[in-house]
């Protein structure tokens, strides 16, 4: 490459860096080092097309150290400790809250969870029945133990009716939606089996969209892929069938913190026995669970495992074969299924190996679930899990009650945030997402001290007890606003969140959709706002470089996703709702947004 051509390419690379928000002087210094590293023999490779991502990675490394990025590994380590403590307490006979069918067998291990939250224990929601005859009807249709009885016994429910296709369900019976109104005997009689079980076990009077179809597919031992937006009720799609079918349902989940939340809810709120296995357990803890699974009548209905347990444990696979031979392997559930795809925003290599489930157990149904998957990710997941012809149950990604908006940051962004909260969200509950731990703390401090707005902050570096207290204060309304990193969101389900503000753009459209989707779960109007300035993107690049472990392929993939998020923020006239939906492969007419009650900012202006 000639000198003049090299200078032209250097100008292009500097332009690329500044366009993405990097400081020009820093970019020039880094580029000089970059050129020296390539040397004379590598000059031909110094182009935007051939080394643009490498240059951005080097620039991110050059600027590293100015911010502390969040890492959920700290939360994962704490979750492992909590789970281990729960397990140890549950295997202590003096603490054991379960009865057993084999009282004379001292070797039997019953697994349940002891609550580790400072919150007062809530009483389970009980479906009240009109009379003793109604109760007899419940017990006739399902052998459901009352909530005061043991939950360790195997609950083998039969389905009276079966439909040939997933979509061929009858319309839901309309039951009064008043929270405290007892269903009448006639209403109970009119329910189909799944509706009846949903009411009796989980206290839900109606199914949300697609839940019934997903549950029916599971009961008929059919594979399926469920795509539901955040707050759509994915967990019920496998938890309800798991309680009705004989045997154990295996749930693969990527994070121990998610597993902890699920097990606590199942055991304490619904009285459904669930336990877990992961690679961090002691050998004696793992052996106790495996021993229980090999019994003729395992006590647990759901077993949560991390993906490496499936791919890397021959003893666990042999235990699954033992269950299968006895007809007690009820099904596999792959939660957060987008982690399977190398094109997804949260790819995990261990998830890629889960195709072995269908390979080893071809007759056992697989249910995959996710809240965020593009069309290409969806196809990759189906292929990788070896269920290419599985029906895809997909809800619309359009959250019609959410209003999307991007606001360009001013020279005083904190003051701008203060005015936004004061003028538009006074006395309302919301989340302010921040990119780093330091940003999270600084924003919360500003709102508390300068604005006199009661605010708490949440990131993985906050001690566990303090995080629990922060979540409790926000959930109960004692504090309206929480400033948080990506660590906040797992297990969060607060209905009346009126706004989600991203103080810095998210790292990917999938992440933004999921985080902003925590607003308006009560169906009422809520606003999703991103505060944007070009130089913030350089911080996203640094975060991605830090989080990808210097793996260039993963960094390049993450960069491509981040650039899509930047494009969303820089839309001048195009419909933001349309871009979000089309990103997930859903066609959308912009006129619908324009004429809706919650048009995006661009449609509102046009």
UniProtKB/Swiss-Prot annotation:
The Helicase C-terminal domain, residue ranges: 413-563
InterPro entries hit by this protein: DEAD/DEAH_box_helicase_dom, DNA_helicase_ATP-dep_RecQ, Helicase_ATP-bd, Helicase_C-like, P-loop_NTPase, RecQ_Zn-bd
Induction: By cold. Repressed by drought.
Cofactor(s) recorded in Swiss-Prot or TrEMBL: Mg(2+); Mn(2+)
Keyword Magnesium set for record: yes
GO molecular function terms attached to this record: ATP binding; ATP hydrolysis activity; DNA binding; helicase activity; metal ion binding
Pfam families on file: DEAD (PF00270), Helicase_C (PF00271), RecQ_Zn_bind (PF16124)
Known catalytic reactions: Couples ATP hydrolysis with the unwinding of duplex DNA by translocating in the 3'-5' direction; ATP + H2O = ADP + phosphate + H(+)
EC category: isomerase
Gene3D superfamilies: P-loop containing nucleotide triphosphate hydrolases
Tissue expression as described in the entry: Mostly expressed in shoots, flowers, siliques and seeds, and, to a lower extent, in roots, seedlings, leaves, shoots, shoot apical mersitem, and inflorescences.
Subcellular location: Nucleus
Residue span(s) of domain Helicase ATP-binding: 215-391
Chain residues that bind ATP: 228-235
Keywords annotated in UniProt: ATP-binding, DNA-binding, Helicase, Hydrolase, Isomerase, Magnesium, Manganese, Metal-binding, Nucleotide-binding, Nucleus
GO cellular component, one term: nucleus
Basic and acidic residues bias (residue ranges): 115-126
Protein name: ATP-dependent DNA helicase Q-like 1
């Amino acid at each position: 490459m000639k000198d003049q051509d090299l200078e032209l390419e250097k100008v292009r690379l500097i332009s690329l860096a500044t366009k993405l928000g990097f400081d020009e002087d820093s970019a020039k210094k880094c580029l000089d080092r970059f050129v020296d590293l390539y040397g004379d023999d590598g000059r031909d490779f110094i182009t935007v097309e051939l080394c643009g991502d490498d240059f951005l990675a080097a620039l991110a490394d050059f600027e590293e150290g100015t911010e502390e990025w969040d890492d959920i590994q700290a939360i994962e380590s704490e979750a492992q400790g909590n789970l281990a403590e729960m397990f140890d307490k549950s295997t202590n006979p003096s603490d054991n809250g379960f009865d057993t069918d084999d009282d004379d067998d001292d070797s039997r291990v019953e697994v349940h969870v002891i609550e580790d939250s400072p919150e007062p224990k809530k009483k389970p929601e009980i479906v009240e029945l009109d009379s003793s005859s109604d109760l007899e009807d419940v017990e006739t249709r399902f052998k459901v133990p009352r909530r005061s009885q043991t939950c360790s016994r195997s609950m083998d429910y039969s389905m009276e009716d079966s439909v040939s296709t997933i979509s061929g369900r009858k319309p839901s019976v309309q039951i009064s939606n008043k929270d405290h109104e007892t269903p009448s005997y006639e209403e109970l009689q009119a329910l189909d089996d799944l509706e009846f079980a949903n009411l009796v076990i989980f206290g839900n009077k109606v199914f949300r969209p697609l839940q019934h179809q997903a549950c029916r597919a599971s009961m008929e031992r059919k594979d399926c892929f469920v795509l539901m937006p955040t707050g759509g009720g994915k967990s019920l799609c496998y938890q309800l069938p798991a309680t009705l079918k004989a045997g154990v349902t295996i749930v693969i989940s990527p994070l121990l913190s998610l597993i902890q939340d699920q097990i606590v809810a199942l055991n304490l709120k619904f009285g459904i026995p669930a336990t877990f296995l992961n690679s961090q357990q002691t050998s004696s803890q793992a052996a106790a669970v495996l021993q229980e699974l090999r019994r003729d009548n395992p006590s647990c209905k759901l077993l949560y495992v991390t993906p490496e347990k499936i791919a890397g444990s021959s003893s666990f696979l042999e235990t699954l074969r033992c269950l299968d031979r006895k007809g007690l392997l009820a099904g596999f559930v792959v939660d957060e299924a987008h982690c399977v795809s190398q094109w997804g925003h949260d790819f995990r290599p261990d998830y890629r190996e889960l195709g072995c489930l269908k390979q080893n157990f071809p007759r056992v149904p697989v249910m995959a679930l996710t809240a965020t998957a593009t069309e290409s990710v969806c196809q990759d997941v189906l292929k990788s899990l070896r269920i290419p012809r599985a029906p895809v149950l997909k809800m619309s990604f359009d959250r019609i009650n959410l209003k999307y908006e991007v606001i360009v940051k001013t020279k005083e962004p904190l003051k701008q945030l203060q005015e936004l909260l004061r003028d538009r969200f006074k006395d309302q509950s919301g989340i302010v997402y921040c990119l780093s731990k330091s940003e999270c703390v600084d924003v919360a401090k500003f709102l508390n001290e300068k604005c006199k707005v009661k605010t708490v902050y949440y990131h993985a570096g906050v001690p566990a007890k303090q995080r629990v207290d922060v979540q409790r204060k926000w959930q109960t309304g004692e504090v309206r606003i929480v400033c948080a990193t990506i660590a906040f969101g797992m297990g969060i389900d607060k209905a009346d969140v009126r706004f989600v503000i991203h103080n810095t753009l998210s790292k990917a459209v999938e992440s933004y959709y999921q985080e902003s989707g925590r607003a308006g779960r009560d169906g009422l109007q809520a606003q999703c706002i991103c505060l944007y300035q070009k130089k913030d993107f350089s911080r996203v690049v640094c975060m991605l470089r830090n989080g990808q472990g210097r793996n260039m392929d993963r960094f390049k993939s993450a960069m491509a996703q981040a650039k899509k998020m930047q494009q969303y923020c820089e839309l001048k006239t195009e419909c933001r709702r349309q871009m979000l939906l089309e990103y997930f492969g859903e066609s959308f007419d912009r006129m619908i947004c324009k004429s809706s009650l919650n048009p995006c900012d661009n449609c509102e202006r046009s």
